[in-house]
């Protein structure tokens, strides 16, 4: 097939995918992402602080989760615990909204005209594709979030509090580091789509298996408690498999240290800290992401079903 023919075939495939988009998925995903991140942002801050804790004198030393929270509260108060909340909420809301938006469109495209459910690998690939598309749009927000979270209160140099807020950070990163600065951590972020892919695959399969086990239709709506259980199990599975990339990504995005790239981060982390360095911050991360995932998925499922019901009532 010629390049022109391949391009036309690719365009036709994407057009077919976008025929399946439903804005209910976007709205429901944004709702879930925003609510969960507002509720649990301080734990995300702790996770980032621990992830980049590599022994440098420029950083405060924390003895544990509670000590970290107490130190931030003592130095900066409630505002300190919500450092970086604006890009985090924007990023999480947009990411979850786009993820559900793209994922459901891709999944609907692949199941069109099929009687049977997707295979596990098809769920995995669909979620990975949705994750890559989402990351291309949202990576600058994650860089900004990390930079804002790593402005330590009480440190000596004023330059370490160089950003006034999300938009100021976006402008300054672009001004001094260009587009490349806004896309720091993009490569490990792409590897990180495996996290979402594994989570969505596990989530879909657990829902299907559970409904089959209790003799319900495969796509039957679950109760809130059932959604929480399925979401928690799928999240724990995904975190256990993919956490090290988050440490690598956070260190690449850290303004206090300059690394030569992904390989340089991995080499230096392994040499100085061993395998434990790749799992720094996993405890506060699990404590945060498991309930955050449960909130996100419960809100998403209920809001999306509500909006779909509204659409059906309008049609009828």
From Swiss-Prot:
InterPro entries: Mitochondrial_sb/sol_carrier, Mt_carrier_dom_sf, SLC25A32-like. It is a multi-pass membrane protein. The chain crosses the membrane at residues 26-46, 89-106, 123-143, 185-203, 227-243, 281-300. One of its GO terms (molecular function) is FAD transmembrane transporter activity. GO terms for cellular component: mitochondrial inner membrane; mitochondrion. It catalyses: FAD(in) = FAD(out). It comes from the Eukaryota. Disulfide bonds: none annotated. It holds the Pfam family Mito_carr. It is found in: Mitochondrion inner membrane. The keyword Membrane applies. One of its GO terms (biological process) is mitochondrial FAD transmembrane transport. Solcar repeats lie at residues 20-109, 118-209, 222-306. Keywords: Membrane, Mitochondrion, Mitochondrion inner membrane, Repeat, Transmembrane, Transmembrane helix, Transport. Disruption phenotype: Embryonic lethal. At 11.5 dpc, the majority of mutant embryos show neural tube defects with exencephaly or craniorachischisis associated with multiple acyl-CoA dehydrogenase deficiency. Neural tube defects can be prevented by formate supplementation in early embryogenesis. Facilitates flavin adenine dinucleotide (FAD) translocation across the mitochondrial inner membrane into the mitochondrial matrix where it acts as a redox cofactor to assist flavoenzyme activities in fundamental metabolic processes including fatty acid beta-oxidation, amino acid and choline metabolism as well as mitochondrial electron transportation. In particular, provides FAD to DLD dehydrogenase of the glycine cleavage system, part of mitochondrial one-carbon metabolic pathway involved in neural tube closure in early embryogenesis. Belongs to the mitochondrial carrier (TC 2.A.29) family. This is Solute carrier family 25 member 32. The gene is Slc25a32.
């Amino acid at each position: 097939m010629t390049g022109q023919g391949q391009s036309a075939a690719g365009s036709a495939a994407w057009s077919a995918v976008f025929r399946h988009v439903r804005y209910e998925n976007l709205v429901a995903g944004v709702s879930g992402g925003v609510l969960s991140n507002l509720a649990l942002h301080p734990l995300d801050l702790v996770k980032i602080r621990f992830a980049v804790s590599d022994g440098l004198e420029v950083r405060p030393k924390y003895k544990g989760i509670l000590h970290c929270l107490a130190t931030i509260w003592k130095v900066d108060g409630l505002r300190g615990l919500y450092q970086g909340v604006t890009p985090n909420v924007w990023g999480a809301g947009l990411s979850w909204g786009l993820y559900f938006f793209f994922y459901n469109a891709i999944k609907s495209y692949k199941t069109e005209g099929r009687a049977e459910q997707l295979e596990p690998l098809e769920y995995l690939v669909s979620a990975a594709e949705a994750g890559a598309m989402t990351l291309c749009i949202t990576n600058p927000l994650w860089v900004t979030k990390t930079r804002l979270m790593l402005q330590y209160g009480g440190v000596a140099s004023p330059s370490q509090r160089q950003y006034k807020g999300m938009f100021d950070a976006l402008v300054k990163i672009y001004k001094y580091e260009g587009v490349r600065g806004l896309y720091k951590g993009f490569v490990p972020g792409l590897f990180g789509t495996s996290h979402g892919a594994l989570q969505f695959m596990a989530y879909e399969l657990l829902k299907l298996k559970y409904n089959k086990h209790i003799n319900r239709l495969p796509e039957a709506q679950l109760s809130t408690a059932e959604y929480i259980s399925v979401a928690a199990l799928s999240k724990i599975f995904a975190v256990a498999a993919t956490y090290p990339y988050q440490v690598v990504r956070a260190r690449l995005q850290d303004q206090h240290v300059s690394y030569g790239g992904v390989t340089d981060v991995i080499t230096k982390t392994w040499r100085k800290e061993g395998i434990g360095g790749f799992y720094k911050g996993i405890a506060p991360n699990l404590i945060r992401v498991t309930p955050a995932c449960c909130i996100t998925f419960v809100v998403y499922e209920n809001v999306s079903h509500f909006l779909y019901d509204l659409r059906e009532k309008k049609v009828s």
